[in-house]
């Protein structure tokens, strides 16, 4: 009897488990087949990040270094052309030579080969010593330093009244000169007093007085002119160009020679009078 009861209990437990499993399967949410096919067919996106590679292209500093290196570098024995025009270390034209003959001459005289003119036909090369190449490179660097730097010109501004005292005007002139030496443009505005009648000529004389303190380095970039309905005057000073500096030095030297010549003429006349 006990055995029968145990069997009945086991069968009842199995039936309960089967019923629960069927109910769960019936109420479970099934995925949409369309969504499954869409997700399966959608490719994965690759995210690409742009990386800046190491290159001197577009880099002005890299280009300048490359140009300097190409402008005067030892070619060595890697001569791409078969026939080239050759100059010796003194600049004398040796004529057209085969590259094999050039290499033999280099080895014999212990010289280097430098490319001089690639646009000519055939290209022009020169035999040089190591010291000559070094001196030429130094000369190129000095020429690059002497070239004016490109970029916007900075302008300094100075404003003061027309009744400025001489001491203050000297101080302003020194400040302007310091700016001019640094290659700045200097805009100077002089305001006229309302209670005093002052002509444009008097204001212009102040500008000229400032300029006379530095005639060897400065000139007018914009000459004095009336502004603000005549209540002020303005001008712009700038540094002399190389050509203007040279012309100024030549004029000063010419004046000095004329002065010496006049002094010599005066002395000779005085000596003639004494002799008589």
From Swiss-Prot:
Belongs to the IF-3 family. Coiled coil: none annotated. Signal peptide: none annotated. Pfam families: IF3_C, IF3_N. One of its GO terms (biological process) is mitochondrial translational initiation. Residues 32-94 form a propeptide. This is Translation initiation factor IF-3, mitochondrial. One of its GO terms (molecular function) is translation factor activity, RNA binding.
């Amino acid at each position: 009897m006990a055995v029968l009861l145990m069997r009945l209990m086991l069968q009842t437990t199995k039936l309960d488990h089967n019923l629960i499993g069927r109910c769960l399967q019936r109420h479970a949410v099934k995925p949409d087949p369309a969504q499954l096919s869409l997700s399966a067919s959608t490719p994965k996106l690759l995210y690409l990040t742009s990386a800046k590679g190491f290159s001197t292209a577009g880099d002005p500093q890299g280009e300048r270094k490359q140009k300097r290196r190409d402008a005067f570098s030892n070619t060595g024995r890697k001569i791409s052309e078969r026939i080239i025009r050759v100059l010796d270390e003194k600049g004398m034209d040796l004529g057209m030579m085969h590259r094999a003959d050039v290499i033999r001459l280099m080895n014999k005289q212990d010289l280097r080969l430098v490319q001089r003119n690639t646009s000519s036909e055939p290209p022009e090369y020169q035999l040089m010593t190591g010291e000559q190449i070094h001196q030429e490179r130094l000369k190129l660097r000095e020429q690059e330093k002497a070239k004016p730097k490109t970029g916007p010109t900075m302008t300094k501004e100075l404003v003061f009244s027309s009744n400025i005292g001489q001491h203050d005007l000297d101080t302003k002139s020194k400040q302007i000169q310091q700016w001019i030496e640094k290659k700045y443009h200097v805009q100077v505005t002089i305001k006229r007093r309302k209670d005093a009648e002052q002509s444009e000529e008097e204001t212009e004389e102040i500008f000229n007085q400032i300029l006379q303190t530095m005639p060897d380095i400065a000139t007018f970039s914009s000459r004095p002119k009336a502004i603000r309905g005549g209540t002020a005057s303005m001008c712009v000073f700038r540094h002399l160009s190389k050509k203007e500096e040279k012309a100024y030095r030549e004029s000063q030297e010419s004046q000095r020679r004329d002065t010496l010549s006049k002094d010599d003429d005066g002395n000779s006349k005085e000596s003639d009078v004494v002799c008589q």
